[in-house]
Amino acid sequence: MESTNPKQQGNPMNPKDPPKTLTQPPAKKRLATVWLTGCSGCHMSFLDLDEWLFELADLADIVYSPVASDRKTYPKAVDICLVEGGVGTSDNLRLIRQVRQRTRVLIAFGDCAITANVPGMRNNLGGIDAVLATAYGTTAQVFSQLPEDSGPVPKLLDQVLPVHELVPVDLYLPGCPPSASRIRAALEPLLHDL
């Protein structure tokens, strides 16, 4: 008697063989990377994973990344997200809250995400108004006028903050930038165990 279950299939060459259950390959993880206020060095280090990127492609779909997709909105149900950079603009603030809400494991990716690092150096200069006055007034040589309208450029926050000061972080991956081997060591167990 033939099985009517579409997930079971007997051997058509030997009808006496019992039907075998077909197994689905494990679902791929949904991986994202985000670039906030930083230099993109962490993403360049991610690309230094070289041949392991092929294995990564078997384990995960990259659903959002400035270096691997042109998607404009952060998707729902992301398993792992590497967040590069500190939070320094109004857009960064909106995005990091959305990332945390839609991501199972959020990784602070590199020193700027962990401590605000180089972008955070402006925090000691008296606030964003003082920084802009110096940049566009005191030291400007060509255009010594502060722009009145920022247009499509997001509003700068008064300070650049590390990610953990705004949302919970699940894993810290230090380095400026973290090495490719360190990135792999952080991702590999998560991709297999989540």
What is each residue range found by the language model?
Residues 14-194:
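Iron-sulfur-associated redox domains of electron-transfer enzymes in respiratory
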Residues 6, 12-15:
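Intrinsically disordered, low-complexity tandem-repeat regions enriched in Proline and Serine
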